[in-house]
Amino acid sequence: VSSVGSLGTCTSVNFIFAKLQMELAASAKDSALGYIKQIEGAQAEQKEVADMLQRCRELQNQAKDSGGCTEMPADVREFMDKNNLTYDLTTGGVSKPTKETADSLHNKDEWDVAIQSLQAYQETIGTDIQTKMVYVQDFMGQYNSYTQGANSAIQSGMQTLTAVARGQ
């Protein structure tokens, strides 16, 4: 598609139409590439969430086995705060706990809150990825349609030129 300029200046309606079709194809391609980059970013975040979920489940199992509490890693807590995800705010003795006053210790049941929140967020990311993939498919369809239109216009123009050259 980068060869749109290589068609040069022309007055043939077919070639002008072909150039327009190629420009539209380039635009569709650029839009698809933008969504592909967004999908790559979302997939990386989805992997990060999956890793955090695995760690949280391991910590929940440790808390269950010991009958006590395990500590939420700082990076998990930061991620959850950054994305407004819920986790248990229970603290020792604070009547209205906040994220600032909450401890990072969770028993087996308290881990459920964080795990469910991460799972819901992971599903949201998955839905977002699927939606963006539909957009990519749409832009790819547009790209194919525009390039086929350009090819048809060029072939039609060439047939006309050939007929003129033969004197038909």
State the predicted function of each range.
Residues 13, 20, 121, 134-135:
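Residue-level detector of alpha-helix boundaries and kinks
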Residues 48, 75, 110-113, 117, ...:
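Exposed alpha-helical structural elements
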